[in-house]
Design a protein with these regions (language model features):
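A short, surface-exposed loop/turn module that caps and links secondary-structure elements
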Residues: 30-58
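Arg/Lys-rich, positively charged N-terminal/basic patches that mediate binding to nucleic acids
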Residues: 1-29
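Preference for short coil/turn "hinge" residues that link or interrupt alpha-helices
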Residues: 9, 38-43, 77-80
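Enriched for short, Lys/Arg-rich terminal
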Residues: 2, 11-15, 55, 59-91
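Short glycine-enriched loop/turn motifs at secondary-structure junctions
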Residues: 7-8, 49-50, 69
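General N-terminal targeting signals
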Residues: 20-22, 26, 33, 64, ...
Length: 91
């Protein structure tokens, strides 16, 4: 499946320490393998439907990754739970 990263995701991602960036990469990789049918649904991702096509996964204890699942996966935002809620209210 095709994917893209929005500017809102990139801006937040670049501000994360490298250790947290690595966890984000690992979570995205695990998600992509699941969506492509390479693995069963992973339990550690905390895959959660926000609304319609908007989904969230965990990247460690603090960070969440918000994405839209439609014809392609669009990664929208990375941040903590409260920041994701604020981002969704602004859309």
């Amino acid at each position: 499946m095709h994917y893209e990263f929005k500017t809102s995701f990139d801006r937040r991602f670049k501000k994360l320490p490298s250790s947290r960036q690595e966890k984000v990469y690992q979570s995205i990789d695990t998600l992509m393998k699941y969506i492509d049918g390479e693995t069963e649904q992973p339990t550690g991702l905390g895959l959660k439907n926000w609304h319609a096509d908007y989904w969230e996964i965990r990247a460690g204890i603090r960070d969440r990754i918000l994405f839209e699942l439609a014809d392609k996966i669009t990664f929208l935002f990375v941040g903590n739970h409260d920041e994701i809620k604020k981002f969704m209210r602004s859309r």
